[in-house]
Amino acid sequence: MTKPSVGINGFGRIGRLVLRAAVEKDSVNVVAVNDPFISIDYMVYLFQYDSTHGRFKGTVAHEGDYLLVAKEGKSQHKIKVYNSRDPAEIQWGASGADYVVESTGVFTTIEKANAHLKGGAKKVIISAPSADAPMFVVGVNHEKYDHANDHIISNASCTTNCLAPLAKVINDNFGIIEGLMTTVHAVTATQKTVDGPSGKLWRDGRGAGQNIIPASTGAAKAVGKVIPELNGKLTGMAFRVPTPDVSVVDLTARLEKPASLDDIKKVIKAAADGPMKGILAYTEDQVVSTDFVSDTNSSIFDAGASISLNPHFVKLVSWYDNEFGYSNRVVDLISYIATKA
């Protein structure tokens, strides 16, 4: 089958890393990018140099209004560049972009993302949680995608992509009565470098490099949308910490069936080596956050950091590159839904 043709709206952290993931995986063909705030020569620079993930190990240039991205042994991507503020005006159809990654963080509802369909896109994948679009987590519920009816979908959040595979394995094997999640989360672009105003959430406006900032997250509750049996059983919060990338989930849960920590490790390792390979990983190494920069997995279970109080009450720890792991799942989701076309 021919590779799915992809457009990217918004060339920020996720937009650029989705393109990197697309080049690495060589499973989709990126044919168009839209960003009203970035000129084409600036796109070349931003794509080539990355403070977190390093310099792009390939070539990137521009010719007219096309980006040319290539890597040895991989397909070249010739990418039409648009600079439209209104998503309805982007000529996705003219570029042949059937699948659009909506990564501006602005058009996250069905109504708003629907504008891409007017420009000729066939499907829209929102790279953020959505209030009303169906959410899919690759490895957990992606097979529930309905090609006939699901035209605008969400890839959920990076944290939900970390938590859901872990929660699925634990719930399938031992049953989760209830659980609380904490994510210790790297800074993101929405935070302030120094103290500043921040709408209703005053703490969010404090300096990102100076503080551990308690914050809300819908990631745990969203697992209930992805795994209906867990609906109403999980909630959580976040601590934003002064690191540039890589976050870690702490899931504290009560189990229906008694299980030793070794029992839990065995089933997670079996899933990581089997049906969830490439999504859920397992480590017994003495790792820290920087060890997972540019890791392509959604969730890396840390066997050494996880603890048990008794056979019914456990704290499970799982790492994730909140930028790159997530961006790889966006590409995987597109690859999957394209097989249903």
From Swiss-Prot:
Site entry (Activates thiol group during catalysis), positions: H185
UniProt main location, coarse: cytoplasm
Alphabetized GO MF terms: glyceraldehyde-3-phosphate dehydrogenase (NAD+) (phosphorylating) activity; NAD binding; NADP binding
Catalytic activity: D-glyceraldehyde 3-phosphate + phosphate + NAD(+) = (2R)-3-phospho-glyceroyl phosphate + NADH + H(+)
NCBIfam families, alphabetized: GAPDH-I
Pathway linked to the protein: Carbohydrate degradation; glycolysis; pyruvate from D-glyceraldehyde 3-phosphate: step 1/5
Full protein name: Glyceraldehyde-3-phosphate dehydrogenase 3
Family recorded in the similarity comment: Belongs to the glyceraldehyde-3-phosphate dehydrogenase family.
Active site residues per record: C158 (nucleophile)
Subcellular locations according to the entry: Cytoplasm
Assigned keywords, A-Z: Cytoplasm, Glycolysis, NAD, Oxidoreductase
Binding site for NAD(+): R13, I14, D35, R85, N322
High-level lineage: Eukaryota, Metazoa, Ecdysozoa, Nematoda, Chromadorea
Subunit and interaction comment: Homotetramer.
One of the GO BP terms on file: glycolytic process
SUPFAM superfamilies: Glyceraldehyde-3-phosphate dehydrogenase-like, C-terminal domain (SSF55347), NAD(P)-binding Rossmann-fold domains (SSF51735)
Gene name for this UniProt entry: gpd-3
InterPro entries listed in its UniProt record: GlycerAld/Erythrose_P_DH, GlycerAld_3-P_DH_AS, GlycerAld_3-P_DH_cat, GlycerAld_3-P_DH_NAD(P)-bd, Glyceraldehyde-3-P_DH_1, NAD(P)-bd_dom_sf
Enzyme Commission number: 1.2.1.12
Tree of life domain: Eukaryota
EC class name: oxidoreductase
Gene3D superfamilies recorded: Dihydrodipicolinate Reductase, domain 2, NAD(P)-binding Rossmann-like Domain
Positions annotated to bind D-glyceraldehyde 3-phosphate: S157, C158, T159, T188, T217, G218, R240
Remarks, miscellaneous: There are four nearly identical glyceraldehyde 3-phosphate dehydrogenases in Caenorhabditis elegans.
